Amino acid sequence: MKNNIITLTQSLIQRPSISPDDQGCQQLIAERLQAVGFKLEWLPFGDTLNLWATHGEGKCIAFAGHTDVVPIGNESQWTYPPFEARIVENMLYGRGAADMKGALAAMVIAAETFVKHLPNHQGKIALLITSDEEAAATNGTVKVVETLIKRNEKIDYCVVGEPSSATQFGDIIKNGRRGSITGNLYIQGVQGHVAYPHLADNPVHNALKFLDELTHYQWDKGNEFFPPTSLQIANIHAGTGSNNVIPGELYVQFNLRYCTEVTDEIIKTKVAEMLEKHKLTYRIDWNLSGKPFLTPQGKLVNATIEAVKKFTQIRPHLDTGGGTSDARFIATMGAEVVEFGPLNQTIHKVNECVNIDDLAKCGEIYYYILEKLFNEQ
């Protein structure tokens, strides 16, 4: 499988698919899958292209990934052209090499090889591929999941090919993620001249005690699977830019990465209580990016651990840290979900790269997971 994985990865990298532009990546994948009997369903939403490809019937084992990549930044800082896909000393360089065209290619080749060997396999193999993960993530996996739910189509197990490995290939399997919720808070005051404060009402001064309480509040202590919930102020702004004007409004944007000990409703209620306690006039808009999820040790987690040990000779660690991914949408279907892929040390950076031997092992691991889960049905 190794040569096929590397060749497909290079072909995908050579298509400059800056999110949400697919640039023909999914068509390339679709042609390979269709050639071995996969049924293809195109699910475009807005500016996003999505592919749902299936083979067989029954319990569904899905692979999920994205063809879109982040911008390259300053191209002059790249040692090798970001869309050339050059291999140097066993490292494949290019935007998307690690996040996540390499893992996506490994998934496609693993599924393709599996159905060639076992065309009448048990269950259903599916690939869910989107071009909207790196940017808004509004017309991609979330919309495909909504479509599947509406027609009572289920995913039982799902491997998301995000680059999960941290310092050594295979050291981390993500079996959950924290939730993410952002508050956009507008605290009202009365604008005026700084020389006449009695004729104004400074929202910055009024908010200081509230902000101190908000940033020091302990939401929970975490649990055996998740670290404690954390809150960070991301943006804050007030004033006109002039030094003689008391601002009329203070804008504060803050984000919480929260564990399963709290809910988004608990967070909203507590923040409202704090605001009322400090007698602030305010408006707050909430944006829930994703709820926390956890896949406990079971068939999928155990199969993934076994596969990683077999092909890397190390025992992976289960982890729920990091940012959000499309796994959060798939988890809402009740699926067992894990994320596993190559090293994440160069993702979104200049000179993004991946070890081609790691990509080959990715393919072997994905193939083994299919074997293991279908044999246990």
Curated annotation (Swiss-Prot):
InterPro entries given in the database record: ArgE/DapE_CS, Bact_exopeptidase_dim_dom, DapE_proteobac, Peptidase_M20, Peptidase_M20_dimer, Peptidase_M20A
Active site: D68, E133 (proton acceptor)
Known pathway: Amino-acid biosynthesis; L-lysine biosynthesis via DAP pathway; LL-2,6-diaminopimelate from (S)-tetrahydrodipicolinate (succinylase route): step 3/3
EC number, UniProt record: 3.5.1.18
GO molecular function: acetylornithine deacetylase activity; cobalt ion binding; succinyl-diaminopimelate desuccinylase activity; zinc ion binding
Keyword NADP: no
Positions bound to Zn(2+) 2: D99, E134, H348
Keywords: Amino-acid biosynthesis, Cobalt, Diaminopimelate biosynthesis, Hydrolase, Lysine biosynthesis, Metal-binding, Zinc
Annotated catalysed reactions: N-succinyl-(2S,6S)-2,6-diaminopimelate + H2O = (2S,6S)-2,6-diaminopimelate + succinate
GO biological process: diaminopimelate biosynthetic process; L-arginine biosynthetic process; lysine biosynthetic process via diaminopimelate
Pfam families tied to this protein: M20_dimer, Peptidase_M20
Binding-site residues for Zn(2+) 1, renumbered to this chain: H66, D99, E162
Cofactor binding notes: Binds 2 Zn(2+) or Co(2+) ions per subunit.
CC cofactor: Zn(2+); Co(2+)
Entry function: Catalyzes the hydrolysis of N-succinyl-L,L-diaminopimelic acid (SDAP), forming succinate and LL-2,6-diaminopimelate (DAP), an intermediate involved in the bacterial biosynthesis of lysine and meso-diaminopimelic acid, an essential component of bacterial cell walls.
Family: Belongs to the peptidase M20A family. DapE subfamily.
Assembly information from the UniProt record: Homodimer.
Matching PANTHER family: ACETYLORNITHINE DEACETYLASE (PTHR43808), N-ACETYL-L-CITRULLINE DEACETYLASE (PTHR43808:SF31)
Protein name: Succinyl-diaminopimelate desuccinylase
Organism classification: Bacteria, Pseudomonadati, Pseudomonadota, Gammaproteobacteria, Pasteurellales
